[in-house]
Amino acid sequence: MAESTLGARVAELRRRRGLSQKELGAAIRRSESWVSQVERDVLPVERLSVLQRLADVLGVAVRDLRPEAAEPMAADRGDGHRPGSAVFEQLRLLLTGHPALDQLFGDEADRESAVQLPELRARVDLAWQLAHESRLIEVGGSLLELIPDLEHAARAAAATQRPEVLTLLSRAYQVAATAFTRQEEVDAAWVAADRALSAAEESGDALSVVAGTYRMAQAFLRLQRLEQAEQAARVSVAALAAQAASEQPKPEVLSLYGSLQLMLAVIAATDGNRTAARTGLAAARTAADRLGEGRNDFDTEFGPTGVAVHAVAVAVELGDAGEALDTARTVDASVLSPERQARFLVDVARAHAQRRQATEALDALLNAERLTPELVHTDHRAREVVRDLLQFSGRRPAEELRELAGRAAVTP
C-alpha cells in the first residue's frame, strides 16, 4: 500500500471492504465523525484495543495499519531505557517472594516490639506527596526501605497498633502500584495492588480495601484489560452505592465512590462507549457536588475540579476535541497536585493535536513539562503528542519542539 499514514490506510481498506464511514464506525463502536477524523489524520489512534478492532473489521493485522503498534508499550523509548528503571527493577525484585520471611522464625514474643507509628505515617505521606508531584524515581527509592520496614512493623507491632500499621502498609503498596502503572510496569503494579488489598483486608478497614481495588483497576486499564478493569471498579461501586446514596454519607465514601465512577467513565471512553462514559461522569459529578469541596481521601484527589479534568480526558478519548477544549477553558486546575495538573495539560495538548493546532498543543506540553518533567518525558500519551507534532511539522520542526523531543527521546 503506497500511502504512508494510518488514516490513508484505513480509508483505502474501508473502501476495499465496501464500507461507509458510518458503517465502519458502527462496527467498532465509534462515530462516523471519529472515522472521518482518523482518515484525515486529524485524530491519532493510540489504543491498541481500538487498532485491533479496526484491523478485525478491515480484515488485516494490526501491524498492517500501524507497524509500530505491535511493539510492547514498554519499548516506547528508542533505547529501551526509562528514567529510574534501575530503581524500579529493585522495587520489582522487592515484591518477589515473601516480604518478611526472616520474621517467621524465632519466638513470637521476641519479635514483638514498639513501633514508631508517627514516623511510619510521615514516610507514607511523603511517598504519596512525591507521587502527586510525579517524582517517581524518588517514590521508588523511598519505597525500597519503607515497604520492608512496614512489613516488619506489621509483624512486630502490638495488637493495638497492628491495624494502623497494616493500613499504612496498604497505602505504601498502593503508591507502589500507582508508580509502577505510571512507569508502564503494569505487571508489577498488579502485584503491588494485590498486596495492598491483602494488607487492607487484614487491617479490617473496608474502605482501604476499596482503595486497593481502585489501584488494581488502574493497572488493568493500563494493560488494556478493559473487562477486568470494569469488573473491579463496578463491584466496588456496587459495594459503596447504598452508603453513597444515604442522607449523610462519609466524605471518604463519596470520594472513593466518585473516583470509581470516573474510572468507569474512562474505561467506557477507552472502549468507545459514549453513553456509559457520560453516565459515569454524571454519577461522579453528583458525588462531587454532594462533597462540595476537593479532597484527597485515599490519595484520589476527588472533587468538582477532579471531575472536570476527567471530563476533558473522556472527551479526548472519544475524539470530541472541541468539547474537550471548551470544558478545559472553564477549569482552574491549580488546586490540584502538579501531577494532576500536568495530566490535564497533556489532555489539552492531545485535544489541540486532534485539531492540528500545533502551536497550542506544544504550549500545553511545555507548561506540563514545567510542572512535572518526568511525566511528560515518560507518559505514553504525552510522547505520542510530541511524535504527532514532529510529523505535522515535516522537515522543519520548531526549535522548542525539537528540544522537547530530545529531552523526551522521541523520534518521528
Q: Language-model segments: which ranges?
A:
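Short, charged recognition helix plus adjacent turn
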Residues: 67-98
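The alpha-helix within a helix-turn-helix
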Residues: 14, 25, 55
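Recognition helix of helix-turn-helix/homeodomain-like DNA-binding domains
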Residues: 29-45, 70
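DNA major-groove recognition helix of helix-turn-helix/homeodomain DNA-binding modules
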Residues: 29, 49-64
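Conserved binding/catalytic microenvironments
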Residues: 2, 112-412
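Short C-terminal boundary/hinge segments that cap the last helix of small helical domains
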Residues: 59-74, 307
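Conserved hydrophobic/aromatic packing and binding residues within compact polymer-binding modules
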Residues: 10, 21-25, 35-38, 65
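A short, Lys/Arg-rich alpha-helix, primarily the initiator
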Residues: 1-17
